[in-house]
């Protein structure tokens, strides 16, 4: 069972040894960070500063969402002890984590508190992504 906490600009979702932070980062911008560390880094990894914006959070047992403008990100428990992360634009599903057991995400420890993360997503056939990721 997950533990979900509301923050100043989103939610923190904890399940087993993973910590997922979903934040409204500006109008129509949602930032998601995932770690196996006990806390999230305060390091500024993004190119943009956080913008003040209106957003909504909704938390129920085993499920939470953050909405900023036309975007919504939702995370929910799955029966086998994993979670599904979904993204919506104008209430229409555009992307979600692949639903095939808990091995759709892989964490490789690199050094110190750093991990390389690989996550499998199911996207729509007409969806294209450019410039994702940071190394």
Where do the protein language model's features map onto the residues?
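N-terminal accessory segment at the very beginning of proteins
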Residues: 1-135
């Amino acid at each position: 069972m997950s533990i979900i906490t509301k923050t100043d600009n989103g939610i923190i979702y904890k399940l087993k040894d993973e910590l997922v932070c979903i934040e409204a980062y500006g109008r129509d911008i949602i930032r998601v960070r995932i770690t196996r560390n006990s806390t999230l880094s305060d390091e500024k990894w993004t190119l943009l500063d956080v913008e003040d914006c209106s957003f909504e959070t909704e938390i129920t047992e085993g499920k939470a969402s953050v909405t900023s403008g036309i975007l919504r990100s939702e995370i929910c428990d799955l029966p086998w002890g994993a979670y599904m992360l979904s993204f919506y634009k104008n209430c229409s599903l555009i992307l979600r984590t692949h639903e095939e057991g808990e091995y759709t995400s892989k964490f490789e420890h690199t050094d110190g508190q750093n991990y390389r993360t690989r996550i499998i997503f199911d996207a729509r056939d007409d969806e294209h992504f450019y410039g994702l990721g940071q190394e």
